[in-house]
Amino acid sequence: LWDTSVVQWGEIDIWINNAGQNTTRVFSWETDGTCTENIIKTNLIGMIYGSQIAATGMLKQGHGAIYSMEGLGSNNMVQPKTILYGTTKHALTYFMRGLAKELEGTNVIAGRLSPGMVLTDFITKTPDGKRSEVFSDEKFRKTFNILADKPETVAKYFVPRILKNLKNDAQIAWLTNRKAAWRFMTAGFRKDRLI
């Protein structure tokens, strides 16, 4: 991926690890071994490999920024039936903060992107492509319609901030605690807006 990108664009200024996988919404002991391995390989090992490749290439070229996409678990929140996903995102945050420390004194920075809840197939479909049970979970639907956004909304917020950021170990957060509180206070205006 790095080599192909360098051939296409010459240099890579920004690298974003955004691959993510989830399990079906079941308790951790009900998740089969293959699903457990896949989520760890995608969310954690893939992010680590991507970061290693990017750091090596960016240190050679003399500059760059590496970001990884946080998620549920990055903020220490524990949500039943999502703990395998949350565990990988908690580890992702630790890794990226550690990578930032290791990159201190270089012209390469590492940071984290915190999008909040985003309406993608990740939420609306199961890992095998079927319609997710979130549509029938009334509590989840209500919360999702209050807090979630479309990908293009979050991207419009992230892109200019990523381009301007020069700070190592930065967290660029879309759905802040303050914004979430405001959305709950104005929840009556957000009914069924996404799902």
Across the structure, where does each feature detected by a protein language model lie?
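C-terminal helical subdomain
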Residues: 112, 130-184, 188
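Catalytic loop of short-chain dehydrogenase/reductase
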Residues: 67-91, 96-97, 101-104, 117
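Conserved amphipathic alpha-helix within the SDR
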Residues: 1-10
